């Protein structure tokens, strides 16, 4: 058992296949249902199965950052400005950038978790809306730290919203 979360936001290869690689634009303008479907196609064999990240998995990664002392609770729950692409980040490009663009936006070898694009998860709020985690480039990491839970209609898509995949180890 256990899981791995993708190192980079999911992007689309030149052949249209989902991938988690450095140096490409993240796959944005995708709604929840399509992100869930795409994430499930990345890997499925006798050892692992991919899926759109669950909220509990997202929380586990944040707890792992604290446990390994790579990030503090304050950097996760109060202000993620310094380790993500946010509107208020120093030298911010103020737009979505290629995955893995800056080493300071990396924690435990996971890039852009705190900013660049916010991310669909399978978590559902009290209504039928789906939870979007983290923050995107257009938001402030102080108001929307990485632990922030936004939400939207599953049919919503936006140029600042992408997703990650998780590999579940069977």
Predicted segment positions?
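Short hydrophobic-acidic sequence motifs that mark active-site Asp/Glu residues
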Residues: 2-4, 117, 162
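Acidic glycine-/aspartate-rich tracts in secreted/extracellular proteins
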Residues: 9-12, 122-127, 168-170
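Disulfide-stabilized, aromatic/cysteine-rich ligand-recognition loop
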Residues: 29-43, 48-53, 62, 127-170
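Residue-level recognition of short, solvent-exposed, well-ordered loop/turn junctions
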Residues: 112-113, 160
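Active-site-proximal beta-strands of protease catalytic cores
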Residues: 114-122
């Amino acid at each position: 058992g256990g899981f791995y979360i993708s190192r980079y936001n999911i992007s689309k290869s030149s052949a249209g296949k989902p991938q988690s690689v450095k140096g490409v634009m993240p796959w944005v303008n995708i709604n929840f249902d399509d992100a869930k479907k795409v994430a499930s196609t990345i890997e499925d064999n006798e050892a692992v199965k991919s899926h759109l990240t669950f909220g509990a998995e997202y929380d586990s990664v944040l707890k792992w950052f604290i446990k390994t002392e790579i990030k503090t609770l304050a950097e996760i729950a109060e202000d993620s400005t310094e380790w993500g692409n946010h509107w208020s980040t120093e030298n911010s490009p103020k737009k979505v950038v290629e995955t893995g663009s800056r080493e300071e936006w990396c924690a435990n070898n996971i890039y852009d978790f705190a900013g660049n694009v916010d991310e669909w998860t399978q978590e559902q709020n009290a209504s039928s809306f789906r939870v979007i985690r983290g923050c995107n480039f257009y938001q402030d990491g102080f108001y929307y730290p990485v632990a922030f839970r936004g939400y939207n209609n599953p049919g919503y898509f936006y140029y600042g919203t992408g997703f990650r995949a998780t590999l579940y180890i069977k």
